[in-house]
Amino acid sequence: MAPAPSFHGHQWTYNLVRGSCLLLLLVMSNLLLCQGILCPSLCPDGDDVCRASLIDLFVHASVLSTGMYNTSVKMFTDFDEQYAQGKEYFINVSDKCHTNSLHLPEDMQHNPTDEQKGLIMWILMLLYSWQRPLYQLVTDLRSMKEVSNTILSSARENVKKLKELQALIERPFSQVIFTARRKMYIARIYWFGLRSLLSSNEDRRHSAFYSLFFCLRRDTRKLDIYTKFVACRLIYKKC
């Protein structure tokens, strides 16, 4: 087995794009190594079924999260090129994301067990928070002129990937689902942007669409990075 990578403090957040790719390569390459060498940190000795299931789960989760991010980039780029050129929709746009109150667990380096649980819960909450806007994008908003064929097909892909990734993570970590839902309710992490997207005021409508696609791109980027990080933690216990 290749030696576990070492990250001190939060240095692994440096250069997110390159780091995300590196983590994916580390996770997938070492998962393949586990096919020939027992991974005692994850499964009981000799439990090949458990080992194979975990390999499939982690590889699949990483592929899904990367796919969601790439599709979200495509959606944002398509809208930006068509409707946002020369506009100032980007000003303070990050302040408008409905997931801003969804914070990463603090002091993640101090207790690996709490870190794992906290990050898995955070990932599920992020997925839950995007169910409604993505669903309404492919239903109530699909006939809007701003929702191009590219955006609509990409949104449908994201709905499918979100459901698949959510089910994949919920299956082995079902014990955190209730707490995640409860925390979202208490923090009021919900999306209420439909009215602005249906506004008769074109500039307001375009600003709302820009914010939606910007926030989706931002959040799926985080989702991709931390899904890979959790996978790395579960495999090596220390990344």
Curated annotation (Swiss-Prot):
Glycosylated residue positions: N70, N92
Primary site of residence: secreted
PANTHER family given in the database record: PROLACTIN, SOMATOTROPIN,PROLACTIN
Cellular component terms per the entry's GO annotation: extracellular space
Organism expressing this protein natively: Bos taurus
InterPro entries the record matches: 4_helix_cytokine-like_core (IPR009079), Somatotropin/Prolactin (IPR001400), Somatotropin_CS (IPR018116)
Origin: domain of life: Eukaryota
Keyword rRNA processing attached: no
Cystines in this chain: C97-C215, C232-C239
Compartment(s) where it occurs, according to its Swiss-Prot or TrEMBL record: Secreted
MF annotations from Gene Ontology: hormone activity; prolactin receptor binding
Protein name: Placental prolactin-related protein 4
SUPFAM superfamilies, A to Z: 4-helical cytokines
Lineage: Eukaryota, Metazoa, Chordata, Craniata, Vertebrata
Signal sequence segment: 1-36
Family the UniProt entry places it in: Belongs to the somatotropin/prolactin family.
Entry keywords, A to Z: Disulfide bond, Glycoprotein, Hormone, Secreted, Signal
GO BP terms in the entry: cell surface receptor signaling pathway; female pregnancy; mammary gland development; positive regulation of biosynthetic process; positive regulation of lactation; positive regulation of receptor signaling pathway via JAK-STAT; response to nutrient levels
Function of the protein: Placental prolactin-related proteins may play a specific role during gestation.
